[in-house]
């Protein structure tokens, strides 16, 4: 008896252009990094101006 092998294709057709998806992923990663840096800068500014108030509010809410 002969055995037949069936070759199955891997997933959808999006793998046809790996450089395009890589470039899009890199662009999204850079945008998220920039947004995260902006948010951290804003938090730093708030803490520089109101560190005492921030700590006081944090402790009042049950933080340690």
Swiss-Prot record:
Keywords: Coiled coil, Isopeptide bond, Ubl conjugation pathway. The gene is pup. One of its GO terms (molecular function) is protein tag activity. Residues 23-52 form a coiled coil. InterPro entries: Ubiquitin-like_Pup. There is a cross-link at residue 64 (Isoglutamyl lysine isopeptide (Gln-Lys) (interchain with K-? in acceptor proteins)). The modification Deamidated glutamine is found at residue 64. This is Prokaryotic ubiquitin-like protein Pup. The N-terminal unstructured half of Pup provides a signal required to initiate unfolding and degradation by the proteasome but is not needed for pupylation, while the C-terminal helical half of Pup interacts with ARC to target proteins to the proteasome. Strongly interacts with the proteasome-associated ATPase ARC through a hydrophobic interface; the interacting region of Pup lies in its C-terminal half. There is one Pup binding site per ARC hexamer ring. Residues 21-58 are annotated as: ARC ATPase binding. Pathway: Protein degradation; proteasomal Pup-dependent pathway.
């Amino acid at each position: 008896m002969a055995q037949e092998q069936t070759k199955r294709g891997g997933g959808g057709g999006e793998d046809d252009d790996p450089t395009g998806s890589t470039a899009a992923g890199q662009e999204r990663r850079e945008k998220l990094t920039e947004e995260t840096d902006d948010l951290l800068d804003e938090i730093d500014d708030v803490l520089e101006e109101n560190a005492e108030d921030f700590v006081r509010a944090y402790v009042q809410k049950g933080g340690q």
